[in-house]
Amino acid sequence: MKFLIVIATLVYIAYDWVSVKKNKNWPVSLSATYYLWPKWVFPSVMTLVGFSLLPVWLEATEGSSLQFLSFLSCVSIVFIGFNPNYKNDKNEYNIHMICAYIACATALLSLIFVLGYWWLLLIFLLLNYLSDIKGFKKHWTYHLEDALIISLLLSIM
């Protein structure tokens, strides 16, 4: 199962890094990177990350009464990938935003209360802040998403 998390981590980091380079700046949000690539890339990455995370995260939270948070978060990540065109389609916008809020909230709660690696999130938020001091206010959504996903991937490893 650890193989799945390694694959998800490598795919996410590669996608993230190349997206920042391609954009020549920090994106406003992770979802905004959808518009930088052919239409299949962002959905493929989010689906791969969501489905790869699911069995490993469920195993990592086994026995916890909050295990359902990992399921909700993974499913929400997959739905974000299935509804990427949030700027041009009102229905996709609604689904995308609801799933983004659910994924963020449930991942954050799981990271803090179940996995116990809340300090990893703080470290990555600080690193993101230091890498973008002047533009952090404009890109705060991206930095929060990025820090949360990387913290989560590392804490499950």
Predicted regions and their residues:
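Membrane-proximal helix-loop-helix units in multi-pass membrane proteins
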Residues: 67-122
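Hydrophobic, membrane-inserted alpha-helices
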Residues: 49-54, 102-110, 124-129
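Helix-coil boundary and interhelical linker segments in multi-pass alpha-helical membrane proteins
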Residues: 1, 55-67, 109-120, 157
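N-terminal topogenic module of multi-pass integral membrane proteins
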Residues: 1-60
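Small-residue-rich segments of transmembrane alpha-helices in multi-pass membrane proteins
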Residues: 40, 97-112, 144-157
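Juxtamembrane "helix-exit" motif on the non-cytosolic side of transmembrane helices
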Residues: 57-61, 82-89, 113-114, 130-136
